[in-house]
């Protein structure tokens, strides 16, 4: 037995800072793999016998030892196993320990070196410091990422000027499915229930299928709690601009194998203020009472729970969440003048009056990983129910009498997701990933207003992805994917009759707004790239083809969209979008010593071509005084990129400067030589941070500020309006105070946005079309106490 044990190797993994053991770390020696147990040990049985045999066959005893763990920097080292050390102790560095300096100063965090695409990881430090009214507004300081804002509490992501269903949002492995096609739709995710985010800029259809044509926002809440631990957090927030009060309470506990996490969040806010007293829209001038953008108040109630099990061979977590929001829409821009309404909108700035929307998003999904000898198998299954209601004051339209209900539209969308992925490690320098994704959606409609029909959508895709390590500096990856989609739309008839003139004979009929259709789509996606890294420089290039299946609104919409004050009409014979893209990246670190990076530069250019880009274009037709818009397809060419400079002259001071640029051009059609809607202007962000010495009971005190500047955006698509450039300065102060314990200090942060109260228009805002500027000066304070 003793001699047998001498042939075994035990590798113990610990945290470099806390010296605690780390269970569930993935350890590989050549083609052999293992996971650390609850004691932080990974045991490789009889490994020295095998190495002795390889030595006798004149093979090298040196092997690549690789260790990965969620929340820690990857460890790689060539080890000579001929020395037969039966026990190895290895300490991993926390991701935050290296990334804190990056994220707190709004720098893009560490890129994924082996992957040839453009990925960035955002951690909790960045999220806490940049916390805004919504998750996507929190992320808009990342170069290349921006948000389409809907009032003060809702927003949706755009990546390099593309948004809606061209950006996939993934939460805990499952694609988030709601009514993201709508311009007035926000993202139903609790931003306090997020531990890290991976952002992929560029085509990602290979791994995620249709809709990932512009990129992916991958939201994760999967960090394992420490063994036999109980921890929690209370987060209290107040913002004075819209009188927001919020509280978020989270608890997590782990036993040996089982663990759970839970979080409850509540926010309530009033109408937000803008730095103007009048707004001009559609030839009307609207006075704003006390600078309040009337009826933009709202509230959110969110709850999340996860239950998990982990051991050496199996890891499984079930996530359950429910996000509920109720928000008002600016009352002067919903197709109904406020002066004709009996609602006293200015009575209180905290009321949520008509028009408004209510949305409830329920989600349950399970992620299970099987750790086998030479591969890992991941299975993800989920169900989502998105229930969205839009309410407005009922009035008669055309031949429709006044409705008895305020519910203008209701969309109830049920989505079923299934993903399976297998990663094989049969060879030292080669990894192959295969996977299948299935999604089924059923979207029901209700209400007296019609925009899109009821539909079902089924998609299935299969992919193969390969990573090859040529040497320690060069990595190559490539893959191919095939997708099939089926979309069925239902017929819809108006509930009232209208006169129809057919061959001179007038009859009263219920008009048909949509027909029954059964549509099929299929396409291939592919990508290939190379990553070349030296000591202080990194080079990447990736080429790929992506596609997107047309949505129900693009194919079959046929109704009035009062939020956008227009009539929208789909085109049933639209083809899938295809995009051909090339991405590159160059990164260099300068004067690096003792893990102190004094300066760095990162450049990420891109170019892509659409052979059939789908968009909504105005026509010369009208419906009840509303201009008609129709969906069409054109060829589009886009290019641009981001550049980021970082400079840390001393450890107390850090500077960051970034610049992002996107240029789009339609190559044919009625809008030839025009740009694309919601194209962001040239934007620069300059950030500064100073860290103070600890003083009395104030610890880790930091002053931070950023200057965000945009140039004029005159490259527009009517009915968009040109937007003048502007510069906004924000600043804040963060400190820790040991109130209850030294181990868990209270974190206090105050932040002042738009310090000089400037009137600024955001070109990608939902309210830009109606001349509504961004909020005026806002002071926010947050208090976080962990235990």
List where the protein language model places each region:
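Gram-negative outer-membrane beta-barrel transporters
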Residues: 600-610, 614, 628-713, 784
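Outer-membrane beta-barrel signature, preferentially recognizing the C-terminal barrel domain
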Residues: 235, 240, 349-367, 505-533, ...
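Short, acidic, small-residue-rich periplasmic hinge/interaction motif at the N-terminus
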Residues: 14, 26, 68-72, 83-128, ...
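Transmembrane beta-barrel wall of Gram-negative outer-membrane proteins
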Residues: 242-269, 280-330, 360, 366, ...
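Short acidic/polar hinge/loop motifs at secondary-structure boundaries
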Residues: 45-47, 51, 59, 174-201
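N-terminal periplasmic accessory domains that precede
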Residues: 86-91, 101, 135-138, 153-158, ...
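C-terminal beta-signal and adjacent terminal beta-strands/loops
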Residues: 269, 275, 547, 611-612, ...
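Flexible loop and strand-edge segments within Gram-negative outer membrane beta-barrel domains
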Residues: 294-300, 313-373, 383-414, 443, ...
